[in-house]
Amino acid sequence: GQEIPQTERVQSNIPAAEVTKATQSPLFLTMLFCMGLTATLELAPGRWIESLMGPAFVEAGFKNNAALLVLVYGMALMAVLRYSAGSFVKKFSPTGLLMGSAILGGVGLFAMTYASSMQSIFLTATIFYVGVCFFWPTMIGFVAERIPNSGALGLCLMGGIGMLVVGYVTVPGVGMIQDYYKE
């Protein structure tokens, strides 16, 4: 049979107890909490795009659901920027990139609430999506670099908590808010 290669943790002689201890550190627990916020900030506004920006699109002569173009544009922009994220991390450091992302994401989200023309919608969406696009991968990288003993378990927990918060808290929560304000 084929021999399965050793994991990086085993090759580095890091005991499993050390991995568990690293995932219980205050910095790691703070990053888990922040990952929940990150996932919410990145994915929740997409649920509101149609209701917030739909009227401006209809006024500009587009059919219903055309506001979803903003969502498609944002996802495409994030894919392109995430592909080149390494150069941004080298230029600004992970902590600097997270801070810049938080500022741009917050400013963009706030500005989107005031956007009323096609130009302002896409400008504010660009600011927002440039801000949030680096959050998820940079947080995973931050844990890998700053809490290396957390290993694969730490990376798995970071991604997992993000998806759990989105699936079990954000989507139902945003849905309840939307249902409340529709009536």
Sequence positions of predicted segments:
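Small-residue-rich segments within alpha-helical transmembrane domains of MFS-like 12-TM solute carriers
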Residues: L43, Y129-P137, M163, G167
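Helix-loop junctions at membrane interfaces in 12-TM secondary transporters
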Residues: T113-T124
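A late C-terminal transmembrane helix in Major Facilitator Superfamily
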Residues: S150-K182
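Extracytoplasmic gate region of multi-pass secondary transporters
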Residues: T20-V72, A76-A79, G167-Y180
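Helix-to-loop junctions at the C-terminal end of transmembrane segments
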Residues: L81-P94
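Structural signature of the two symmetry-related core transmembrane helices
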Residues: G96-A111
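Intracellular juxtamembrane helix-capping segments at the cytosolic ends
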Residues: F134-P148
